[in-house]
């Protein structure tokens, strides 16, 4: 989001977070098309650790296309570089990772986030709001309009306003324009 009212800023749009355009990196880490090398994960880790970040909650987040890309990387003799570690331990270069397709692949490009997830703060605004209605209606799974009034029912809706923020912006880095198989 934009960070405005009712739109969390999140990590990827936070101006204080290191943003790494992988298409501009040295060829040791990525090609100009954004195809990563096996050295890139350690580069991303080092870009965060150089900020003296606590190492108690470090990890990666990327989408499933990035995960499959890393699992398919091979060395010069054809052996998989990361597949065993990722499959057996759920780690990449020794750090845990999680996948989510909320980090989209658009035009064959995606993003990778690395950071100290203990520095991600989740906050609630106010208390849980409860609203009730005896006059409301809803549509059931079959497409029928159901009236609460006609069925002597009360509809209940719970609303909880939640936002995220970073305790230390320097605890995160976002790699962008990462080329992945679509």
Can you name each region flagged by the protein language model?
Residues 1-47, 179-182:
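Alpha-helical scaffold segments that mediate packing/assembly in large oligomeric complexes
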Residues 11-16, 66-68, 103-105:
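Short, catalytically relevant binding-site loops at active-site mouths
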Residues 28, 36, 74-182:
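Sequence/fold signature of self-assembling virion shell proteins
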Residues 36-43, 61, 65, 151, ...:
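Generic recognition of stable, solvent-exposed alpha-helical segments in well-folded globular domains
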Residues 49-53:
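Surface-exposed acidic, glycine-flexible loop patches that form ligand/cofactor-binding
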Residues 60-69, 97:
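Generic detector of multi-pass transmembrane helix bundles and their immediately adjacent loops
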